[in-house]
Every structure is written in structure tokens, then in C-alpha cells.
Amino acid sequence: ATWLTGSYDPELNLLYWGIGNPGPDWNGDVRPGDNLYTSSVVALDADSGTLAWHFQFTPHDTHDWDANQIPVLIDREWEGEERRLLILANRNAFYYVLDRKTGEFLHGNEYSKQTWATGLDENGRPLEIPGMEPSYDGTLVWPSLQGATNWFSPSYSPDTGALYVSIREMGSYYFKSDVEFE
């Protein structure tokens, strides 16, 4: 599910939507694997609705860090070449730069305190730290349940080349409980 309005590129005729997290939120035992398309951005053909590509920010999300942020579309030079980019500060505390035509991961870095990953690999997949999953006794993790950012509208300035986004630096205790879920 989506929370907010997506973004549209009229030249590529693609719609970009941030997708919510899988359920149940804090017990991933009942939903093994990456939980494809959740906590992701999807690019859809505006006429047919056909999936063009997707990028998953938080595979097997057990911290409620869905990708509800509005994807920001910019055209600018990237490594000496003019590119169509999608930029997004995700709730998981990482900032991402993607090619908005192909979904290719170009860059990512931490923008707020986080304690659950050592960084991102060459494909943008988080390098998770063992023991940061929710537990029956509670696990203290940054960012919090509210994320490093949330549904607040971001803004990009072509003058400064910067993305402006509200940031939260707080942690939460994540508790796992047994749930029946279908």
C-alpha cells in the first residue's frame, strides 16, 4: 500500500510510488525472505500500470521503515553524464540516488543515526548487523518506529544541489511477539 502521492515523469511516462512495509510489522518469522516490493519504490508505466522496475530499500523490513516518502525527480549531471535521477531519504536512515529510467542504484549513504546496518552494498542492499531484529525482550535500534524521516514533504534546490528533509534522530525498543498472520 502507498501512503502519499507519487511522482510522475512525463517524458518517460513513468509513475513512481513508495510502498509500505510488510505485516506483521515486528515479527518477520511468519514471512521469510525479502518480502518482494514492500518497503520499496516502484516505477509503473502510466498508461498500462505495468511494472517498469522496483528498488527495495529495506528487504524483510521488521522495523516499520516503509518507503512512504515522496520520490524526488531531478535532472542533473552524475559522474560527468546528464542523468534523470530519483532521490529519496528513506525512513531506514539511508539516502538513495537511483537512475529513474532503469532503477539502477547509483549512490547511498547514512543521513541520520542508525544502528542496524554497517552500510549499503554495491547494489544498495543494506548490510545488516546481526542482533538488531525485534526480540521478545526488546532491542534498542536507531532509527525509531517513526523512522529517520517520515511522510513530511522533501524539497530539492537546484541552486544548492541539496535535498532538504526533516530528520529525527531517536531510537526505539522493538519488541517481537507471537502473532497469527495470514
Q: Regions from the language model: what does each represent?
A:
Residues 28-67, 74-82, 94-140, 171-182:
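Extracytoplasmic/lumenal domain signature
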Residues 1-30, 40, 66-90, 150-155, ...:
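Repeat-blade elements of multi-bladed beta-propeller folds
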